[in-house]
Design a protein with these regions (language model features):
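Start-of-domain signal
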Residues: 1-39
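Short, basic/aromatic beta-hairpin or loop at an interaction surface
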Residues: 41-56, 98-100
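Short alpha-helix capping/helix-loop boundary micro-motifs
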Residues: 59-64
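Loop/turn positions that initiate beta-strands
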Residues: 72-73
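A generic structural signal for residues embedded in beta-strands
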Residues: 76-77
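Short, Lys/Arg- and Gly-enriched loop/turn segments at beta-strand edges
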Residues: 82-91
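Conserved small/polar residues in nucleotide/adenosyl-binding loops
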Residues: 116-118
Length: 118
């Protein structure tokens, strides 16, 4: 099991890469490590934060995709209808943009859910 250490402000989380269910996304994202971006609160998706990535292309298609991630299920949206992004849900979330409902690749899961701060 490959793990990630994720730091958001003063908080640090440990997540497992979902390599069995999203192998292409995990492999492509792993090549970017260490990864650093700004995270902002989501506008359309509910209780989530997101990392807008514009036209960035990770060269992956859809795999293990969902519109309804549980808290801690991190999604990568490969772009198409809306800009590329990473979604970091911490509560009730329906992944969407101003274009409507989206689906993203669930590629990592925070497994210390009690540590997610709302």
């Amino acid at each position: 099991m490959t793990t990630l250490t994720i730091t958001v402000g003063p908080y640090t989380y440990t997540a497992r890469m979902e390599e069995a269910d999203a192998p292409a996304t995990c492999a492509a994202f792993a090549k970017l490590l260490p990864y650093k971006q700004k995270i902002i609160h989501a506008r359309w998706s509910g209780e989530a934060c997101w990392i807008p990535l514009g036209e960035f292309n990770l060269n992956v298609g859809y795999e293990n995709h969902t519109s309804h991630p549980a808290p801690g299920e991190i999604l990568f949206y490969p772009g198409g209808f809306s800009e590329t992004e990473i979604l970091f849900p911490y509560g009730a979330t329906l992944f969407a943009s101003r274009m409507g409902q989206l689906a993203g690749n669930h590629f990592a899961t925070i497994f210390e859910l009690s540590l997610i701060h709302i």
